[in-house]
Amino acid sequence: MAPSAPAKTAKALDAKKKVVKGKRTTHRRQVRTSVHFRRPVTLKTARQARFPRKSAPKTSKMDHFRIIQHPLTTESAMKKIEEHNTLVFIVSNDANKYQIKDAVHKLYNVQALKVNTLITPLQQKKAYVRLTADYDALDVANKIGVI
């Protein structure tokens, strides 16, 4: 079945317009000044894994309860509590000062001003946690059960 008369005329008019307008773009030949062709950098999308390599993500073994092992209750520790507003803890050897400060905040709801650490001759890490002026180390020690 042949196309209808109005469709034919529409197609002819469209062709006429294209002829009158002429070719829009002219292909310009690129001048190459080098004998070496450097391949252009193209988009490289990130690879997507088809399945996870581990069935469950690894949980952190350094939780707050592992970082702070126990408070120290020696006479020198009591003196620090009374005179310097400082709590003394035995902590994990793997913990750093930031982790200790965060663990004290999470476990005892107190803000630490600074943390000093040392390794004892018994290869234990001891942390001196100085509290801010807002908190009293004696009250916190009572709450913990040190005194």
Curated annotation (Swiss-Prot):
Cited function: This protein binds to a specific region on the 26S rRNA.
Region (Disordered): 1-29
Gene this chain is encoded by: rpl-23A.1
InterPro entries, per the entry: Nucleotide-bd_a/b_plait_sf, Ribosomal_uL23-like, Ribosomal_uL23/eL15/eS24_sf, Ribosomal_uL23_CS, Ribosomal_uL23_N
Entry's Gene Ontology cellular component terms: cytosolic large ribosomal subunit
Keyword Ribonucleoprotein: yes
Record family assignment: Belongs to the universal ribosomal protein uL23 family.
Cross-referenced Pfam families: Ribosomal_L23, Ribosomal_L23eN
Keyword tags: Ribonucleoprotein, Ribosomal protein, RNA-binding, rRNA-binding
Sequence ranges of Basic residues compositional bias: 18-29
PANTHER family the UniProt entry points to: 60S RIBOSOMAL PROTEIN L23A (PTHR11620)
Protein name: Large ribosomal subunit protein uL23A
Organism of provenance: Caenorhabditis elegans
